[in-house]
Amino acid sequence: MNRTSPYYCRRSVLSLLISALIYAPPGMAAFTTNVIGVVNDETVDGNQKVDERGTTNNTHIINHGQQNVHGGVSNGSLIESGGYQDIGSHNNFVGQANNTTINGGRQSIHDGGISTGTTIESGNQDVYKGGISNGTTIKGGASRVEGGSANGILIDGGSQIVKVQGHADGTTINKSGSQDVVQGSLATNTTINGGRQYVEQSTVETTTIKNGGEQRVYESRALDTTIEGGTQSLNSKSTAKNTHIYSGGTQIVDNTSTSDVIEVYSGGVLDVRGGTATNVTQHDGAILKTNTNGTTVSGTNSEGAFSIHNHVADNVLLENGGHLDINAYGSANKTIIKDKGTMSVLTNAKADATRIDNGGVMDVAGNATNTIINGGTQNINNYGIATGTNINSGTQNIKSGGKADTTIISSGSRQVVEKDGTAIGSNISAGGSLIVYTGGIAHGVNQETGSALVANTGAGTDIEGYNKLSHFTITGGEANYVVLENTGELTVVAKTSAKNTTIDTGGKLIVQKEAKTDSTRLNNGGVLEVQDGGEAKHVEQQSGGALIASTTSGTLIEGTNSYGDAFYIRNSEAKNVVLENAGSLTVVTGSRAVDTIINANGKMDVYGKDVGTVLNSAGTQTIYASATSDKANIKGGKQTVYGLATEANIESGEQIVDGGSTEKTHINGGTQTVQNYGKAINTDIVSGLQQIMANGTAEGSIINGGSQVVNEGGLAENSVLNDGGTLDVREKGSATGIQQSSQGALVATTRATRVTGTRADGVAFSIEQGAANNILLANGGVLTVESDTSSDKTQVNMGGREIVKTKATATGTTLTGGEQIVEGVANETTINDGGIQTVSANGEAIKTKINEGGTLTVNDNGKATDIVQNSGAALQTSTANGIEISGTHQYGTFSISGNLATNMLLENGGNLLVLAGTEARDSTVGKGGAMQNLGQDSATKVNSGGQYTLGRSKDEFQALARAEDLQVAGGTAIVYAGTLADASVSGATGSLSLMTPRDNVTPVKLEGAVRITDSATLTLGNGVDTTLADLTAASRGSVWLNSNNSCAGTSNCEYRVNSLLLNDGDVYLSAQTAAPATTNGIYNTLTTNELSGSGNFYLHTNVAGSRGDQLVVNNNATGNFKIFVQDTGVSPQSDDAMTLVKTGGGDASFTLGNTGGFVDLGTYEYVLKSDGNSNWNLTNDVKPNPDPIPNPKPDPKPDPKPDPNPKPDPTPDPTPTPVPEKRITPSTAAVLNMAATLPLVFDAELNSIRERLNIMKASPHNNNVWGATYNTRNNVTTDAGAGFEQTLTGMTVGIDSRNDIPEGITTLGAFMGYSHSHIGFDRGGHGSVGSYSLGGYASWEHESGFYLDGVVKLNRFKSNVAGKMSSGGAANGSYHSNGLGGHIETGMRFTDGNWNLTPYASLTGFTADNPEYHLSNGMKSKSVDTRSIYRELGATLSYNMRLGNGMEVEPWLKAAVRKEFVDDNRVKVNSDGNFVNYLSGRRGIYQAGIKASFSSTLSGHLGVGYSHSAGVESPWNAVAGVNWSF
């Protein structure tokens, strides 16, 4: 019970009162001394006995009070200071004390006693052997478990000691709490939650240490410990097993203790201080702290097994704060040091193959070999030696007395040699660095290209080695042949020197006062810094090399710059210095710099005098007060002037005159800024900008092409504003004495402080006190008339603009190509050609006069009154709320008021937008004018060049828009939504288009009388409601049905009109009549109740899909009409007729309007025929309908009497189905022609080879090269009705060899050739065949005259088809094919004197492959068979002659007959079966020629021929050849 509780206070006061008021003799108590039964709320200040028969509740035990609970029960007792409660058994009954509070008293629990839920605020609890304490909370007192048991104890600020084989289970020790487990006791399931547990000569099991808790173990055992955030220390021969160490937890093992089976997790610490730790599992991030001095550690880490034993450490991993000391005479092998890991190799210790990763540190005072540094740090301390170190990244620091031998310094790493440190044999790779401090030693250095050496020439520095150029040294205060690059740096200190230094990219050479350098090469990216009083001779500065210096007396620099010019800095003068790439020059007071060039990132500070400096892009120069700059050329750089700059030329870049002054500056593309009492005098502005800021002044500027801007507080005096220049005077700026040319642009505001000047016409102008007078605006000039100010007689020419703000007034402005924007009031403005006046919301224009080419625009809530609109003037406005317009034009008065526009004239850019709910009447839209109606209009006339739209403006559609009596007279009208009632369209340029409705809520309707005449057009989109329209198309007026994908599908798009009258008019059922026969699957049906007159209908068809446009007349049709259908190469799926026209009757006549009355539909031609039921169909039966047979006149004789015994009529014979008469199309004929051509090409080419073999007969044997050219004409007819004329020209070249054999001669040869055939189709069009051939031949000639010849030939054909359809449309295609053929011939040569007769017989065969190809009109073709086999029998008669000049000639004649056996070369066209190109039969051949030998090696021949058969006639066949023998 809490002592401060009200209940407790009441009881205490009551006890005192009773004691004071009631006299009690000594020994007499006010409580029950022997409790039998239940006693409540008593205060015990004497002895009370509670045996097994008694129970007390809420007993208060005060000083001198004692409660003995022996076998009984005590509940809720409070034991005050001096009070005592004893709990034990009696008569085998267990004594129980529940929920006792000890507040300064004592509770003792003996054998057979149990305490449950005790709270110790202060005081003590003793648990003896056999006693049990359950659930005690120790807040401030103490608990002593002496041989007894304590379970579930919470120590929260107090202490507990468990001794003499006591047992504590489930204890929780919070912060400030402690528990001592001693004298053979046992603690199990303990949680040390920030508190402390001391264990001596005892055992602890299943302990959890967290939140900074501590467990100290002496001569004891710790089993199954989990350390989550505290410390366990094993001391004095203690042992631990099965320890888990988590982040923040630590196990310390001293030199006499042992820990076995340890799991160390990330952030956990195992600290072995000379003791033993076995079966360690070191997880990633786990921390191991130990040394090699008597320590034994073994286990596994992320790299594998590791151990420390007998002063040797193998494979140890140090990270995250881990540390290993290698003690004297100890060693470590393959140690890995990661982030925050450290290792110390002490004196006389060794470490081999160490790896130092990023964040790891190794300190060496002993010996380290073969170390790899991967981002970590190795410190070589006094007496330390590192050999064979490889620095991949990271740092090796060689301290005083330390030494490193054979070090590899890789990219991104560095070796630092401090004073009295030594590096031997260091190899610096590209990107690596060797840093040698003053007094450091580095010998045998190998400096590779791209590596960095950082050093100085100070006392004691001793460096030597090789770089990419030569051997180098730094010793005795002198550096020779040093290469500096990639952060390399050499400082030449006072009284020392450097020679032959090379400074490459990233390198830097610093020459201090009284130091000297000679023969320095400064390359791109390198830096040479010569400090005041330093000396650098023979400097060779390359492009991009940076020089940092000043002109201070005593500084000496000489050399050549990057442009090859000699430069110097001496005797307080700098000449030809180039500054770039971080280079800088300071010109001190009393010195000067001449012809300096400042490139990108170069810098120059002038305190003295500067002449002729060039500032290129990104270069900077500052001219300080009292300093001067003359003739600077600024080309992209920046010059800041606090002093004086004269005759500067600014081509690009910037000059800032900040309190200084300039004279005669020339601005040609750059910027000059004058500010802070700076002054620019006589500046010439050709292009670029001069801007005058607050307290800046420009005087006498000439503005030729750039701009002068005068900002607030700035002043421009006597500026000359020439053509192309701009003078911009802003609010509170001033410009006086301006001389303005006619095209000089003045930009000003009426809030300028003061503007005065004279125009080119001599008129003075001004802006003062908010009033602008006679301002001229042109070529970009702008005057802003601000609120409560005014302008008068402003002249706004081309490119000028006047802005009249709210509450401002402009009077008498003239616009000649310029613009006036009116937000206030404009009076008596005149708008000439190109001028524009725009009246904005709440603006008002009064008495504006618009001349031809001028434009007045009135926006919403704008007002324009008393307007005069002359012919050719444009008015742009709408019927929006608030707009009020009134005026006159050539047709009378016009107005817009109350959302009604009347008698508007829109032309030459004029525009009227009629908004929804508003109206326009009697509008005229002329050339260049436009009108958009979202509301209603009537009697609108759209003349040539005018444009009218209904129901749409930009992206707004209005379904309720309506127009009545629209007259389109050469103009254009488009209906997007709404209703058009009664319209007329006339003129060749007149067009009316009704677009497909956007959706169901924005319909498009056409109703009433609509007349299209004089070549005008009416276009109807799909979905337009025309059911109430009566259309008339006359005098070549046309109606177009323009469907889109909204009605694509298997059904036609539907169009319906009430009536259709054609009077030489045209109706196009699809919009693309001139395109190939494709409609993207869209076909239209036009339905009308009545059709009359005469005219033309144009229809699309898709015969392959049995689809097409269609005309339907519900009632009678009268008149004469032509139907035009497009040709196509695609065949119908069937031969069924396609209905194009349906009528309900009448005498109308429909004929096919195509050429000849035929249309090409695939393979066959079609005609239009009536079916006798008022329908007209397309059919491939081209046979004309028979003339009708008149009914016979009735016989006047009376019918005979009926036969009393009639016999039935005999069954009539069935009427045969008529066979349609078909005719192929020209496209089909072209395909068949091409299929018949290839055998003829092969044959013509073969003839040149046969001719070659014939002229060799009986000639000497030689090796020969020969060539022949030939030309053939074939006139061909085929059974399929496809005729053509072929003209072939070709050339063949070959080589052969004739050789003697017994009783004869053999010939072997090869050839190749090319021929080209032009094929003219009888039905129109043409084709061509290009043929490449290759082959060989052989011949055997017996001495008797008998011979045998053979030829084999391969062909590659390229065929092109350029056919024509009946309408003249193209049917083009091409394909490749291959051919193979052979020829065998045998004969006998008979000779009689000079006469020779050679009868012969031959057999020839040819075949070609058959690709499928398509024509451009959709026709497809495939030759099923292309073959030729023929025999030939004939004879040749020749006569040999020798002429007087020795030349031999042999004329000859030949006659033969040929039989072609192949009669089934079939060609498949579309899907209409096979056509047979029948060229079989006999053919007569007649030839003549002559062979001549010009010399023993040169001969030639010439031949001509004629042949004829039933299908092929060759009017000529000519060949000429030449032969060279060798």
UniProtKB/Swiss-Prot annotation:
Family matches, as InterPro entries: AIDA, Autotransporte_beta, Autotransporte_beta_dom_sf, Autotransporter_pectin_lyase_C, Bact_Autotransporter_VF, OM_autotransptr_brl_dom, Pectin_lyase_fold/virulence, Pertactin_central
Region entry Disordered: which residue ranges? 1173-1223
Q: Kindly state which keywords UniProt assigns to this record, in alphabetical order.
A: Cell adhesion, Cell outer membrane, Membrane, Signal, Transmembrane, Transmembrane beta strand
The keyword Disulfide bond belongs to this UniProt entry's keyword annotation: no
**What are the GO cellular component annotations?**
cell outer membrane
Q: Which coarse location class describes where this protein primarily resides?
A: membrane
Cellular compartments annotated: Cell outer membrane
Bilayer topology term: Peripheral membrane protein
Q: Function, please?
A: Upon overexpression shows increased adherence to polyvinyl chloride (PVC) plates, increased mature biofilm formation.
- Protein known as: Probable autotransporter YpjA
Task: Identify the gene encoding this protein.
Answer: ypjA
